[in-house]
């Protein structure tokens, strides 16, 4: 099935990253599928048994679950990836070593590689590697909501530059709220508007909420 066939067969939208119970409930009213994301901040390896049990409970409650790894240690990405956690694996971008390791390790998605940076954190080399390894780039709305006007303008500029590379190299991608509260949840139209604002055509923005998310969710 082609990107265009999936995108325009009907309005079917997927929210790939919601991190709060109330946010998930609200997003479920607006999207056909919602992935609940557990945020995991690591400096050292976790208790794997406890983590697997928690993810099992979350799958029972929400169905589709992702694990967002936030770490300063690149080696932990490979370690988490090697475990059979039965959840999508996202990595919070920012540190260039983390961005590179996430892509090299073949995680499901790198979220906001520009996060906290003075540049996009994503270049031609990483774009080519992400395309080959099927690592999606997550364009997240949440940091924009929490930034001052200067910060928002800078983030949008980094998003635009990243989108140009994503488009050129045909990197998988999705647009998401990354909502950590119900107040940060936005519907498909608002997320599509973000895509259009960073340079996507309407079909490209739609595919970032439909075709690409669905191909990722099918892994579960």
Swiss-Prot record:
Its EC number is 3.1.26.5. One of its GO terms (biological process) is tRNA 5'-leader removal. It catalyses: Endonucleolytic cleavage of RNA, removing 5'-extranucleotides from tRNA precursor. One of its GO terms (molecular function) is RNA binding. It comes from the Archaea. InterPro entries: Pol/histidinol_Pase-like (IPR016195), RNase_P_comp-3_arc (IPR023539), RNase_P_p30 (IPR002738). It is found in: Cytoplasm. GO terms for cellular component: cytoplasm; ribonuclease P complex. The keyword Cytoplasm applies. Keywords: Cytoplasm, Endonuclease, Hydrolase, Nuclease, tRNA processing. Its main location: cytoplasm. Part of ribonuclease P, a protein complex that generates mature tRNA molecules by cleaving their 5'-ends. Belongs to the eukaryotic/archaeal RNase P protein component 3 family. Consists of a catalytic RNA component and at least 4-5 protein subunits. This is Ribonuclease P protein component 3.
